[in-house]
Amino acid sequence: MKQTLQLIKYLFPFIILAAFFCLYKKEYSFMKRFCWRMTMTFSARKLFIIVVLSSLIFMNWCCYMTDPNWAVAFAAFMTCCLLFNRVADHVLHRLHERKRFWALTLMLALVCYSIPYMNSIFHVLYMLGVASVFYPSEKVLRMKDDTDSIDNPLGLLQKILKNYF
């Protein structure tokens, strides 16, 4: 069991990276619906946060079962702070809008990945960095309230897709 959890722990970032490159800025109908729902409904954004947090909780559990240490406790604390929807929403918006914070988060994640006992902190920072790319910015969320676009939903969808990433 321990070997399986270690395999999951080390393959997880590569699976997320492959999914990221397969979906980022693609014109699939799935991505159009995803961007539309993430922009238009709060419940879709909340579901997205729940999926990200459940994967983080699973990865924290995998890290705890394979090699428990203080870094796992700190990663679990960071994940618990993100359980508040307002905090997670704020963090994902800031990382999406401010590219320096996003780059700093991913650089810090790489540093944590290179240190063996800080692998659990890497998972938290890495997931936040990848998830923030697919989270809508404040600019896109303001577009949905534009009175000119309400009459033309297809035009609004094209505008959202153009400015989403």
Give the location of each predicted region.
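Membrane-helix interface and helix-disruption motif detector
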Residues: M1-K9, I57-A75, V91-H96, V111-M127
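N-terminal signal-anchor/start-transfer transmembrane helix
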Residues: Q6-M31
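Alpha-helical membrane-associated segments of multi-pass integral membrane proteins
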Residues: K9, P13, E97-S149
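C-terminal ends of transmembrane helices
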Residues: L23-F34, L83-L92
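Membrane-helix boundary elements
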Residues: K32-N69
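Hydrophobic, membrane-inserted alpha-helices
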Residues: I50-N60, T79-L82, W102-S114
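Hydrophobic alpha-helical transmembrane segments and immediately flanking/interface helices
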Residues: N69-H93, P136-D146
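Short, highly charged, low-complexity non-transmembrane loops/tails of multi-pass membrane proteins
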Residues: V140-F165
